[in-house]
A protein has these predicted regions:
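Solvent-exposed, non-transmembrane regions of membrane-associated and secreted proteins
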Residues: 5-195
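N-terminal positive-inside, membrane-proximal cytosolic segments immediately preceding the first
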Residues: 1-3
Length: 195
């Protein structure tokens, strides 16, 4: 019986690993494209609902809790737009890993109490380009009552994933964050209300 050369084993193993890496890359790109397409469909539905709001029974001071609209079994609180990176996405009312695969999610707070925190996957079609934002870039959050909230980026930082207090109680009106590609840290964007 003939001995297998260690060099041949290394070559075969290398090819297998390259194929696995290529497969993982293709899977991630497909998941990103699917999430982006699904989010754009929801944005169109949300915009239609905001343009044709149902009449309210009473008027008065705004409830600090954001109004929710259900689309395809998911609840949404609004739409986020970041022109500098070409983002226009729906925002789900509650955070969970399965929801993050569809759209950004509110994790804490409200635009009505100036402590809104929104998380999203680092898909290119979601928050994958947050690192390219700079101080002064504009961000808009429109809630389901059609109230437009204008923000301006104050700073962009990379934080430890356990920095929950720094995010939840940041003192900023809006905080956006996503994982870095390795998943060990979080790209975090702190925004103030626009003047």
């Amino acid at each position: 019986m003939r001995k297998v050369s260690p060099g041949l084993v290394c070559i075969v193993l290398g090819v297998v690993l390259l194929l696995a890496a290529g497969g993982l890359y293709a899977y991630n790109r497909c998941e990103d494209a699917h999430a982006g397409a699904e989010a754009q469909t929801v944005v169109a539905d949300l915009q239609q609902k905001v343009e044709n709001p149902e009449p309210e029974a009473e008027s008065g001071p705004l409830d600090p809790e954001l109004p929710v609209v259900e689309i395809d079994g998911n609840e949404y609180v609004g739409e986020i737009s970041i022109p500098a990176i070409g983002i226009d996405l729906p925002v789900m009312s509650e955070w969970s890993y399965p929801r993050l695969k569809i759209a950004p999610c509110r994790q804490f707070g409200s635009s009505r109490t100036d402590d809104l925190v929104i998380a999203a996957h680092n898909y290119e079609s979601h928050f994958g380009k947050l690192t390219s934002l700079t101080a002064g870039d504009s961000v808009t959050f429109t809630d389901m009552d059609g109230i437009v909230n204008e923000y301006v980026v104050n700073k962009v930082e990379v934080l430890d994933p356990h920095s929950v207090e720094e995010v939840e109680h940041s003192g900023y009106a809006l905080v956006l964050y996503t994982c870095t590609y390795g998943g060990k840290t979080r790209v975090t964007v702190f925004c103030d209300r626009a003047s």
